[in-house]
Amino acid sequence: MGDYGFGVLVQSNTGNKSAFPVRFHPHLQPPHHHQNATPSPAAFINNNTAANGSSAGSAWLFPAPATHNIQDEILGSEKAKSQQQEQQDPLEKQQLSPSPGQEAGILPETEKAKSEENQGDNSSENGNGKEKIRIESPVLTGFDYQEATGLGTSTQPLTSSASSLTGFSNWSAAIAPSSSTIINEDASFFHQGGVPAASANNGALLFQNFPHHVSPGFGGSFSPQIGPLSQHHPHHPHFQHHHSQHQQQRRSPASPHPPPFTHRNAAFNQLPHLANNLNKPPSPWSSYQSPSPTPSSSWSPGGGGYGGWGGSQGRDHRRGLNGGITPLNSISPLKKNFASNHIQLQKYARPSSAFAPKSWMEDSLNRADNIFPFPDRPRTFDMHSLESSLIDIMRAENDTIKGRLNYSYPGSDSSLLINARTYGRRRGQSSLFPMEDGFLDDGRGDQPLHSGLGSPHCFSHQNGERVERYSRKVFVGGLPPDIDEDEITASFRRFGPLIVDWPHKAESKSYFPPKGYAFLLFQDESSVQALIDACIEEDGKLYLCVSSPTIKDKPVQIRPWNLSDSDFVMDGSQPLDPRKTIFVGGVPRPLRAVELAMIMDRLYGGVCYAGIDTDPELKYPKGAGRVAFSNQQSYIAAISARFVQLQHGEIDKRVEVKPYVLDDQLCDECQGARCGGKFAPFFCANVTCLQYYCEYCWAAIHSRAGREFHKPLVKEGGDRPRHISFRWN
């Protein structure tokens, strides 16, 4: 738009008018041939011209430490060059800056060329930069900064300057001023809430120490144009370290206005850890954040640099706190939305371990914030840790109250060491809710059987071999009364070779199922899956239409047995002890292991495992189950009851409970010494014994008073213990 300024006339207490200077274009300015001591910015604000004849200045602004004329503002370019060289030499020595040779080595060739091209326009900045920079409103300018010895040509330390607000008294050395060859102004940082005092040693600008753990809710994510005054005030000056003149910072046209309420984000714009990245080159990753074609731009809204507008400092500060607070979106029509920060997610892919439990506070330790400078850091914020925690919560809701469903998948038996001979083949995967099933219902609840083929928990192939998920024996109920074996076979032959069977078929010599149900024994397990796919699901049950000579398309219930329902681990952290396992006889076949575990845990507590005994060939339930407890008290309470009422849905049956007897245990009394190392044949289920005995030890122990009525249990076929009558000799 051009190099223009404006002036404001304010009424002082003395009645005189203090005319604030107007910056004119260099071609329109008259030449001057004298130079006085360059005043401070505060003095320049309160400076009175010779026309009003007063040196007091405006009483409501800052007192002028030196008298200054408006004619002293603009210098010749030749004299400014010499003063600039004289000013920078002692300043570089005081602030331990690298030598010009070293700076030339660090400076990129493109930036170095820019500095040489703009040296002519930049020649008068250090000599009278503080005059040219005062294009802002004089009302707010006094709160931006005080005189620093590194700004003007005067090298006298201004030790008398102090903060006008007593509340802000702790200041720390930060960044020395430097000229910008791009915008022809001295770039400086914001100093909100007070006027920092200048250092008497090296002229470095001082600003307040704020703790890093300031609440993230007061960050810099406020829009630059939220305030009503932001539309009426031009740019505020901002100091910049002279080392960073090699990586020139540009203001993005997308956010031309600084935040008007400077006290809101003062604590986050001057953080000590921001100054550590000044000497680091900008990252080309941030080029998407600014319309500038050069990768050195960090003044765009998305730029994570140390001086960027738009609240990126407060946003980055919140990332370190893991507060989980998303930045406020800008309401400015000129400012980009912060949603563009998520573009960085494409460059830094999330690790596959995001689903592992992860603490919010430990999340910052593994991030790239400690490696990359601000422009290079991934913009994942706290959503990564927040999303990880939400996933853990959702997964916990799908687990059981005390244990984990889907504890082990087929082929992963190593996750829980269970004796396969004693406790079953696999740990199952099933759902607790809902459990509305009946005697003719398999109780699968909300697990559609026909959709099981595509279930992520069921693997159709494993190590090149097909994994069976269903028993080859299928229950069919509700058959027409006049249907015979041949008609049943013809109705289901399209799914694969099969044999029709029902209880006592050989003895009855009947061609019709006596009670309206039968079992289909398929040759291949894939035939069962094909049958399930052809069924119609209603209320969690599967139906298929079958015709007879008198009834056409009668729906019959298809009840397959899911192999994963044979076992259920409620508490995988507890070891399974055979001495704390009970045998449950007469279990209804639709009852699943998870349902048996929940019933026993509700009655006695401490259940860690439940299993359904299945046929070793067809893997179909045999009508018995096992329950393992984690403590002796629950085990004794279960076997002392002897009978348990199993109530679940339509199931209401009284079953018998006995200790689970093993056939490979040595005698607990003699450890096989009296019986030649043979396994103990007897087990005493009385709560006073609960031990295995050989024949000799049983006779010796139970001949005592009070134990003569104990009945031993023996292991027999079908994993069922039975009572035997022990006769005394």
Swiss-Prot record:
Residue ranges of every copy of the RRM domain listed in the record: 472-563, 580-662
Residue numbers binding Zn(2+) 1: 667, 675, 694, 697
Keyword field: Cell projection, Cytoplasm, Endoplasmic reticulum, Metal-binding, Phosphoprotein, Repeat, RNA-binding, Synapse, Zinc
Region annotation (Disordered) ranges: 20-49, 78-133, 218-328
Modified residues (Phosphoserine): 97, 99, 137, 252, 255, 330, 332
Sites where the protein binds Zn(2+) 2: 684, 689, 702, 710
The protein's assembly and partners: Interacts with TOB1.
Written domain comment of the UniProt record: The 2 RRM domains and the C-terminal region mediate interaction with CPE-containing RNA. The interdomain linker (564-579) acts as a hinge to fix the relative orientation of the 2 RRMs. The ZZ domain (509-566) coordinates 2 Zn ions and is probably implicated in mediating interactions with other proteins in addition to increasing the affinity of the RRMs for the CPEs. Unlike in CPEB1, a continuous polar interface is formed between the 2 RRMs.
Function: Sequence-specific RNA-binding protein that binds to the cytoplasmic polyadenylation element (CPE), an uridine-rich sequence element (consensus sequence 5'-UUUUUAU-3') within the mRNA 3'-UTR. RNA binding results in a clear conformational change analogous to the Venus fly trap mechanism. Regulates activation of unfolded protein response (UPR) in the process of adaptation to ER stress in liver, by maintaining translation of CPE-regulated mRNAs in conditions in which global protein synthesis is inhibited.
Protein name as annotated: Cytoplasmic polyadenylation element-binding protein 4
Organism: Homo sapiens
